[in-house]
């Protein structure tokens, strides 16, 4: 084992020999990070990425100034999808160390799950991983049901079945109930719905390779929302919450769904499929119908839903949509408290009407006349939320995954959003 490289924090500028703008320097004891009070967490994260890039795989966070957020910022930048890294953590009080350990367990689970190859992580494996994580943190407070394959069709989960039927790996719906009250009749405070497309080829509206090569990550919404529930539980969540993960492959085969197909949903809506690559909304619709039936105070869905959201925000922000201004502001306040980036994008009543079909009530994609793709996707989902004006948040997870490394992140999953959603769930 190599000797650990000591990483210390300093509020003094680097020696002039390192340059006027140096944010880190090397000394006899190791590496010093020079904080300037402007963006200390970002500075630490970017420095950690550089340290990893230097091939230093064993570090000790030493000296004064470290806390949970600073240690976590270092790990966020230091962690990568290849190889092993060892960190000797700074001395923290019990509460801070517990918080750090829970982040390391749960948010690393999210990142590792999203990074897993599609060959290893099919719909059933994703659902089971979620069950294992949540049972691990909540034990007997969790119960669940897994419905898959033809059972979905027989129970009229036709959006999920339609999308997933083209794969040899059957589609799966995980319905999980976290009930810490011990009362089977306790009201459901929140329902969480996640898109779990474990590989998205685009179906017959096939993607080009440049857009398909990262589609193992199209289950990022399901992983993020699962991690958020687990993390909220570690922070003391004492209300009943239900989780719905809509898991499927979107592949091409003789049994795959086709353009022009019409899906009949349980809430009476009919949807014409005019783009098989707009499949995420089709599976989420089934989860949102179940969520609405619980009459919760809060519904949150999370999905890597549209390229339009990434075009607007890049990979730095998650996109937020809601008709409920007060609730949207609460989510944004939670994001600020957790140092995570969310940005609200427009969602208006007219977006619900920008999905015309000649053969069904809705089209699953907007036409060229309605180019606001992220907003029309959110508008589509609203048709499956009973009281869409109040208590519903849609998160288009633009910041879930990066195809290549940048100065603060390795390539792959980020884990962003977990803490914000958990904060919102435990804020009241």
Curated annotation (Swiss-Prot):
What general EC class does the enzyme of this chain belong to? Answer: hydrolase
Protein residues bound to Mn(2+) 2: 195, 200, 218, 279
Tell me its cofactors.
Mn(2+)
Keyword set includes Manganese: yes
Any one cellular-component term (Gene Ontology): cytoplasm
- As recorded in UniProt, its EC number(s) are 3.4.11.23
Where does the record place a coiled coil? none
Q: Where is the active site?
A: 207, 281
- State the SUPFAM superfamilies in the record: Zn-dependent exopeptidases (SSF53187)
The answer, when asked if Cell inner membrane is one of the entry's keywords, is no
Reaction equations catalysed: Release of an N-terminal amino acid, Xaa, from a peptide or arylamide. Xaa is preferably Glu or Asp but may be other amino acids, including Leu, Met, His, Cys and Gln
Report the function annotation for this chain: Probably plays an important role in intracellular peptide degradation.
The record's similarity note reads:
Belongs to the peptidase M17 family.
Q: Which PANTHER family match?
A: LEUCINE AMINOPEPTIDASE-RELATED (PTHR11963), PEPTIDASE B (PTHR11963:SF20)
| Subunit structure, interactors included | Homohexamer.
Task: Specify the protein name.
Answer: Peptidase B
Origin organism is Klebsiella pneumoniae (strain 342)
Name the gene that codes for it: pepB
């Amino acid at each position: 084992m190599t000797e650990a490289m000591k990483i210390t924090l300093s509020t003094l500028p680097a020696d002039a020999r390192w340059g006027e703008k140096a944010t880190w320097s090397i000394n006899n004891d190791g590496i010093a990070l020079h904080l300037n009070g402007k963006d200390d967490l970002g500075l630490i994260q970017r420095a950690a990425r550089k340290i990893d890039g230097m091939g230093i795989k064993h570090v000790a966070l030493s000296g004064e100034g470290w806390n949970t957020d600073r240690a976590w910022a270092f790990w966020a930048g230091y962690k990568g999808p290849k190889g092993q890294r060892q960190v000797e953590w700074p001395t923290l009080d019990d509460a801070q160390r517990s918080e750090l350990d829970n982040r390391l367990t749960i948010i690393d689970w999210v990142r590792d799950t999203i990074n897993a190859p599609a060959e290893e992580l099919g719909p059933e494996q994703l659902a089971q991983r979620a069950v294992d994580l949540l049972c691990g943190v909540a034990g007997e407070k969790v119960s669940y049901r897994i419905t898959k394959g033809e059972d979905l069709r027989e129970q009229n989960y036709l959006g999920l079945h339609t999308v997933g039927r083209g794969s040899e790996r059957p589609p799966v719906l995980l319905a999980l109930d976290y009930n810490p009250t011990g009362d089977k009749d306790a009201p459901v405070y929140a329902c969480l719905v996640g898109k779990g497309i474990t590989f998205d080829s685009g179906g017959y509206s096939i993607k080009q390779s440049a857009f398909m090569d990262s589609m193992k990550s199209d289950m990022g919404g399901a992983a993020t929302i699962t991690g958020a529930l687990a993390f909220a539980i570690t922070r003391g969540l004492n209300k009943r919450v239900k989780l719905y993960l809509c898991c499927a492959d979107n592949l091409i085969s003789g049994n795959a769904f086709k353009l022009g197909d019409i899906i009949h949903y349980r809430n009476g809506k009919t949807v014409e499929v005019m783009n098989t690559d707009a499949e995420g909304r089709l599976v989420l619709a089934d989860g949102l119908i179940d969520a609405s039936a619980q009459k919760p105070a809060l519904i949150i869905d999370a999905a890597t839903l549209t390229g339009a959201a990434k075009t607007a925000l890049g990979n730095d922000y998650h996109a937020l949509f809601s008709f409920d201004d007060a609730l949207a502001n609460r989510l944004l306040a939670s994001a600020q408290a957790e140092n995570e980036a969310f940005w609200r994008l427009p969602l208006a009543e007219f977006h619900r009407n920008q999905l015309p079909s000649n053969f069904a009530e809705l089209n699953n994609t907007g036409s060229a006349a309605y180019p606001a793709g992220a907003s029309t996707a959110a508008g589509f989902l609203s048709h499956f939320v009973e009281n869409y004006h109040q208590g519903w948040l849609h998160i288009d997870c633009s910041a879930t995954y990066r195809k290549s490394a940048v100065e603060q992140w390795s390539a792959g999953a980020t884990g962003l959003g977990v803490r914000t959603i958990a904060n919102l769930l435990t804020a009241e």
